[in-house]
UniProtKB/Swiss-Prot annotation:
Belongs to the DAD/OST2 family. Pathway: Protein modification; protein glycosylation. This is Dolichyl-diphosphooligosaccharide--protein glycosyltransferase subunit DAD1. The gene is DAD1. It comes from the Eukaryota. Keywords: Apoptosis, Endoplasmic reticulum, Membrane, Transmembrane, Transmembrane helix. Widely expressed. Greatest expression seen in the epidermis, intermediate expression in the fat body and midgut and mild expression observed in the silk gland. Component of the oligosaccharyltransferase (OST) complex. Signal peptide: none annotated. One of its GO terms (biological process) is response to cold.
Amino acid sequence: MGSSAFEVLTFFLKDYKANTPQKLKIIDAYLLYILLTGINQFLYCCLVGTFPFNSFLSGFISCVASFVLGVCLRLQVNPQNSSNFCGIPPERAFADFIFAHVVLHLVVMNFIG
């Protein structure tokens, strides 16, 4: 009953390495990168300022939206969720992800000016 946080984290990492498919690990690495980029932008905003506000806002919105799209892709590609997405093959999910990213970045570039 008295498991420490370190033991729980160690168990989680062992289980993640053993049971998570390689495709999901790549998506998780992408999500971690996007999360760290968003945190970096937010810290820069807090410490330095938001002088070109449109640039900051579009970059931060791009990070948040990219993270959401990545999570949606991970949900659709995960084999454990195949019953929820029975009519969507992984290739279609990836194509939807790419299309949504293109639209997102067109909107972001338009917002920058």
